[in-house]
Amino acid sequence: MDVTRLLLATLLVFLCFFTANSHLPPEEKLRDDRSLRSNSSVNLLDFPSVSIVALNKKSKQIGRKEAEKKRSSKKEASMKKVARPRTPLSAPCVATRNSCKPPAPACCDPCASCQCRFFRSACSCRVLSLNC
């Protein structure tokens, strides 16, 4: 019994190793820079060189000022969007996106209608026409 379990465990490990290695791409082993240059499809000299330039204090301050302006404009835009007070809903109606099973009253929004799905098990008030 223990021998069969050992064989099955070994087989399982072998299969896991085999499937992991079968999905990996084959590796190309390059021995020196000459073979790298001859085997590469992209010539490294085609790309422009990158130059790193140190920033002076003035350019750093301008960058900070621009970032602060962007932050303040975002804050002002979020403050300007104040939620308008909702009109109080009258009792004998159902709000939009709420459940409106057939014994329930009609939808409060005049453009909304009660739409049922799954054999009238899930019903909700939905606005169907945007031009209303």
Curated annotation (Swiss-Prot):
Biased amino acid composition, Basic and acidic residues: 63-79
SUPFAM superfamilies noted in UniProt: Agouti-related protein
PROSITE patterns according to UniProt: AGOUTI_1, AGOUTI_2
Annotated stretches, region: Disordered: 61-87
Keyword Glycoprotein attached: yes
Keyword Transmembrane helix: no
Keywords for this protein: Disulfide bond, Glycoprotein, Knottin, Secreted, Signal
Residues in the signal sequence: 1-22
Pfam families in UniProt: Agouti
Domain of life: Eukaryota
Domain Agouti residues, every copy: 93-132
Location in or out of the cell: Secreted
Gene3D superfamilies, A to Z: Agouti domain
GO BP field: hormone-mediated signaling pathway; melanin biosynthetic process; melanosome organization
Record-annotated disulphide pairs: C93-C108, C100-C114, C107-C125, C111-C132, C116-C123
MF-aspect GO terms: melanocortin receptor binding; neuropeptide hormone activity
GO cellular component terms listed in the entry, alphabetical order: extracellular space
Glycosylated residues (UniProt): N39
Coiled coil: none
Alphabetized SMART domains for the sequence: Agouti (SM00792)
Task performed by this protein: Involved in the regulation of melanogenesis. The binding of ASP to MC1R precludes alpha-MSH initiated signaling and thus blocks production of cAMP, leading to a down-regulation of eumelanogenesis (brown/black pigment) and thus increasing synthesis of pheomelanin (yellow/red pigment).
Domain notes: The presence of a 'disulfide through disulfide knot' structurally defines this protein as a knottin.
Name recorded for this polypeptide: Agouti-signaling protein
